[in-house]
């Protein structure tokens, strides 16, 4: 896995563990000292998402796997509002960045993807217009350039509180 995945997953699980510990009334504690602070909001859907299932936790279920694809489709970003010769307008609230990777299921339920060459609001200009895309289809972002860029720099720090006491042991020696 790449560094973006590792940073995102580690931060997300660390926050979950902190929540569990905070609600445990002292029953659980961290094995390490200090506190980690993150410069981003962890979101597992942004770096890895194949959907999920409760498996057999609630009894047997028909949705135990994804029948359409074993690949990560990413985060839902909206539906296709219109398709023009060189651009696609998306209905939704997602912000797009140049270089984002988007995908969709075509009419044969096959996963297809394309790269956003340029984005202006909710209008995207693909590097190459995808075939098989039609109005009303759901779009998913499986590569989020803004999130990737955010995580390439310093994204976390760990601070440990200390108490120090300094004494002079000999004149001039501390």
Question: How would you label these PLM feature ranges?
Answer:
Residues 1-174:
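Surface-exposed amphipathic alpha-helical tracts and adjacent flexible/coil segments at the periphery
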